Amino acid sequence: MFTRQIIAELTGYLDEFPAVAILGPRQAGKTTLAHQVAQRLTLLGPSPGAAMPALYLDLETPADLAQLADPSAFFARHADRLVILDEVQRAPDVFAVLRGVIDQRRRAGARSGQFLLLGSASIDLLAQSSESLAGRLAYVELAPFVVTELPPTDAAAPGALWLRGGFPDAYLSRSDAASLRWRQQFITTYLERDIPLLGPRIPAQTLRRLWTMLAYEQAQVLNAARLAASLGVSGQTIARYLDLLCDLLLVRRLQPWARQSGKRLVKAPKVYVRDSGLVHALLGLGTVNALLAHPVVGGSWEGWIIENLLACAPQGTQASYYRTAVGAEIDLVLELPGNAGGDVLWAIEIKRSSAPTLSRGFHIACDDISATRRLVVSSANQRFPMPGGVEHMPLLDLMQELRAMQIARLAA
């Protein structure tokens, strides 16, 4: 069984907040993680096994949903247990009740570790909870598997993770072909069942075409007008569809650098299908050889690196990219939460080659934003200095450094 790296902050937040929400796409492992946390809390009770076991409800199951017909009474009956509500966006009325229950228990002296909410769609969960549970709820995002969660003894694991993506069932499939079939079925189920359950009335075929077009244009600057013309819809419709895919945590819009630099900057976001395995499934790429021969290979690699890094970045990190009208560019700018001494700006260039070289435009861009650190991540597995004060770091090393920063912040 894989140990998810966010389990430490999840248990920490349950010690501090009455309610914690795990957000992540379907099949990312939220339910498994919730049960692992519940088991750990039970074992770490006043004495081993003394804490009451958690109570789990899957709100997509009619029988479990029916138990919340009178949520106030239900929560009162189980006041001594951690209540886990899976797919909580299926019961939107419960948020207002949770607020009253939490406040009542606070007055009685209970302050933390009461509710664990799991949601596959930030659209509903964030909108419903931002006001009702303000100050009472902490959020944790669970991404599919990332490199720091793989067995350290398996040298081939990162390559398989890039090809298959991080959804547990896809990554752990018995073969590349079986993994591809799983991902293709995942896409179909999302389009034909899951999205309609959330309410939006969007033709499945239209959304599939858009998703596939985004995969073809992985890591490119968004051209909404071209997408709209290709699909025969308006620019506003493209924006609405993109909002949906982003809110479902399936697509990322990486915003451009927003501060003044004295240069004319590209102002549209770059767009990424967040899971590399879904990129490859949308394009029918089932093997490493097929991927390496496809034009998307560079964009796929860039998106995969970015998702792995952001999964480890400390809370409060702001991510963007930098590009001027004349081509000076940084693939990823991380504004890390720093001390009172000022900004911590990491400029990260992403290269697939194991012998990376840098353009003059990268150094110009780093000067433009006054980057405090200049980094290159490539397929090479060694750390070494490069000209111009640039450090080359393997992906795993940089992820571990970011992760250590997050753990230090949690311990503060």
Region roles according to the model:
Residues 1-14:
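Pre-Walker A adenine-sensing motif
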Residues 22:
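Hydrophobic anchor at the beta1->P-loop junction of P-loop NTPases
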Residues 25:
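P-loop (Walker A) phosphate-binding loop of NTP-binding proteins
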Residues 30:
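Conserved lysine of the Walker
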Residues 33, 37:
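Hydrophobic positions on the alpha1 helix immediately C-terminal to the Walker A/P-loop
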Residues 95-117, 131:
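Conserved catalytic/switch belt of AAA+ P-loop NTPases
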Residues 112-113, 120-122, 126-225, 249-250:
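Interdomain motor-coupling "hinge/lid" segment immediately C-terminal to the ATP-binding subdomain
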Residues 176, 180-344:
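Accessory nucleic acid-recognition modules appended to NTPase machines
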